[in-house]
A protein has these predicted regions:
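Mobile, glycine- and charge-enriched loop segments
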Residues: 6-31, 185
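Core catalytic region of metal-dependent phosphoesterases/phosphodiesterases
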Residues: 21-133
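Structural motif
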Residues: 18-20, 50-52, 152-154, 180-181
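Polar, enzyme-active/binding microenvironments
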Residues: 17, 43-44, 244, 248-260
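Short acidic low-complexity segments
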Residues: 129-149
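Acidic carboxylate-rich catalytic motifs and surrounding loops in phosphoryl-/glycosyl-chemistry enzymes
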Residues: 98-104, 139-142, 244-249
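Conserved beta-sheet core of the metallophosphoesterase superfamily
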Residues: 149-246, 252
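Short acidic-hydrophobic surface loop/beta-edge motif
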Residues: 7-12, 141-148, 191-193
Length: 262
């Protein structure tokens, strides 16, 4: 085989690895879990980092804060800087980082709607407000096909199911492509196949959990919710993609790729 043909074959067979970051909702993130995921990112140096949204909570400008003392707390700057620091630490050793829009990050725009004269200010557009371009991160305002046949979404684009993986799978059926998402705070994968005989296709719905500390979520009654902490690791060769879900324990520890992070 000619060397040029061998090189092309090797290029086609190169494994690309993704680290998928679930909902952080800074400042309500699980600090130990996030530190351990950063250790994983630095050790493995993934080719790409995918962020499913809700990286920052924006709790002081939520509709729930209106008319309460929370609306007067001046914490957005600190929350933003902490979010940027965490995202940088998670992606600094990767060639690319993609971030998808989400309902919590939409809170900035929804707040600007109350003062329409400010909407056109470029520095108040969410990607600029967060400085993503300066950090080499790409922001997507709509669902993004990051791999042939696979869409990155937040997960609020359709109806939400209480069963892990089904929210993503319903989006996959709607779009005709497999879906990777967050939003539900659940960790799971579900699949659906359709066709006749040897002519069929399989669709997958993958939900990647969350990286929140539920003790900080004061709105949860008794701190109870059908949530699971986790992240995902993806490996691709050519058009083939294999997802691996990584459950994270309540103390923030987990095992991934043969190593314990604790």
């Amino acid at each position: 085989m000619a060397s040029s043909q061998l090189f092309l074959l090797q290029m086609r067979m190169t494994i690309k690895r993704y680290l998928v970051i679930s909902d952080l909702q800074v400042p309500f993130h699980h600090e130990a879990a996030v530190k351990n995921v950063i250790k994983l990112a630095r050790r493995e140096k993934f080719d790409s980092v995918l962020v499913v949204g809700d990286e920052i909570d924006f709790n002081t400008i939520s509709k729930w804060a209106e008319g309460t003392p929370l609306a007067y707390r001046q914490t957005i700057h600190d929350d933003r800087e902490l979010t940027k620091s965490i995202l940088w630490d998670l992606s600094e050793y990767s060639r690319e980082c993609h971030i998808i829009r989400s309902n919590h990050t939409d809170r900035l725009y929804n707040t600007l709607l109350k003062v329409p004269g400010l909407i056109s200010l470029p520095e108040l557009q969410y990607p600029a407000f967060m400085g993503f371009k300066d950090m080499g991160m790409e922001y997507h305002r709509t669902a993004y096909e990051f791999h042939p046949g696979w869409m990155l979404a937040h997960g609020d684009e359709g109806n939400m199911s209480q069963h892990a993986g089904i929210t993503a799978l319903n989006l996959a059926k709607k779009w005709g492509k497999s879906v990777l998402c967050g939003h539900t705070h659940r960790l799971g994968m579900s699949a659906y196949a359709e066709g006749v005989g040897s002519h069929y296709r399989a669709l997958y719905g993958v939900e990647v959990g969350n990286l929140m500390d539920r003790k900080k979520a004061s709105y949860l009654r008794y701190g109870s919710a059908n949530w699971q902490m986790g992240i995902a690791i993806l490996e691709t060769i050519g058009k083939t993609l294999t997802p691996t879900l990584v459950p994270i324990n309540k103390d923030g520890s987990f095992t991934a790729l043969g190593k314990l992070y604790a």
